[in-house]
């Protein structure tokens, strides 16, 4: 009788531990070499656009906490290349050449998968009475959410390609 209780207890304990252990789809989100901005993907994107509107500059080092390591490297390399000077002199983070007066980033709360590595978020931008929409791609580096790309959706696009990355990559 003593062994029968023990033989029932062990499988039940294993079954219970198997039911309560949840592993994320991606165990490692990589490392991050730069500083970090606190918040979820939509919060970090909103802080980025608020910072850009307030400071009105394309200083890559000041924007570094908001950008992925790869995008920051691409922008830094592009800033030394005369072929990309016009794009970087204007607003590379928007479809339009001039900075917006306001920006509203869509909520990421509607995204069902908490383990998502890439989260595209729509951004409603306005300058005066004109409004347009772009899309920002957020990724997770380590524990930080950062901007990895901007998709230009705003109609009169000043860039040479449909996304920021495509516009500054040397092909």
Swiss-Prot record:
Lipid attachment points (N-palmitoyl cysteine): 19
Keywords in alphabetical order: Cell membrane, Lipoprotein, Membrane, Palmitate, Signal
Hydrolase found in the keyword field: no
Compartments it resides in: Cell membrane
Pfam families noted in UniProt: DUF3828
Signal peptide bounds: 1-18
GO cellular component, one term: plasma membrane
Residues anchoring lipid (S-diacylglycerol cysteine): 19
Membrane topology annotation: Lipid-anchor
Presence of the UniProt keyword tRNA processing in the record: no
Name the UniProt record assigns to this protein: Uncharacterized lipoprotein YbjP
Gene from which the chain derives: ybjP
